[in-house]
Amino acid sequence: MKIAGIYLAAGNSSRMGSHKLKLPIGTMTVGSLALETALKSSLAAIYVITREMDEVEWIPADMKLHNKCIIMPCPSANEGQSESLKWGIRQAQTNHMDAALVMLADQPFITVQMLEEMIVCMKSNPTCKFIATTIEQTIIPPVLLSSSMYAELLTLDGDTGAKTLLQGDFLQKGHVLPCTDQRLVFDVDTPEDYQLLLTDKEKTK
């Protein structure tokens, strides 16, 4: 089973007031932390979906050269998150990927173990439509989507994400993996979030 990562990095950082993925964290950047995690995982490829004008200085040179890292500027990214997701899904289709693991570039604490648990779960349940992370029964990224969902995902528009499909009776067609540590799925949206991230990284040095 071939599984790609779709790394959503085309947000407009409106709540941060500046390009949040460029913000430094030690020798890394906010946007490169989860990308490093994805590249260390068993994912076959990582499609990094960016805005067309993004010069991707936030991605370290060695990651850009990694054979699994494929940077894909999305020309319609300003039309909403669904456009970035569909850009990645189309690439997964073209490359005959059996599933796609959707990640957010602003979730710096995602671990390789989390990704591998999702991948193993999908490989153990090949007829499963999705594997989703949950916090207190709420679905959040990362989420792993079977190729059997690609057609439905390509119908999304605006700022809607895959989560809109993962509700009601459809939930019976997948698996959820509860996350008991909210820190792992923390996302950096505001200057206050960034300060929390800096403080946390300082503590764990």
Predicted regions and their residues:
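Conserved N-terminal catalytic core of the sugar/cofactor nucleotidyltransferase
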Residues: 33-98
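Hydrophobic residues at beta-strand termini and immediately following loops
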Residues: 25, 72-74, 133, 177-179, ...
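Residues at secondary-structure transition points
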Residues: 17-20, 25-29, 75-83, 109, ...
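Conserved beta-loop-beta/alpha segment of the NTase-like Rossmann-fold superfamily
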Residues: 78-149
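Short, conserved active-site loop motifs that form the nucleotide-linked donor/cofactor pocket
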Residues: 3, 68-70, 174
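Conserved alpha/beta core of the MobA/IspD/sugar-nucleotide pyrophosphorylase nucleotidyltransferase superfamily
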Residues: 1, 157-205
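N-terminal glycine-rich phosphate-binding loop and ensuing alpha1 helix
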Residues: 1-50, 55
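Short, glycine-/small-residue-rich phosphate/pyrophosphate-handling segment
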Residues: 139, 143-169
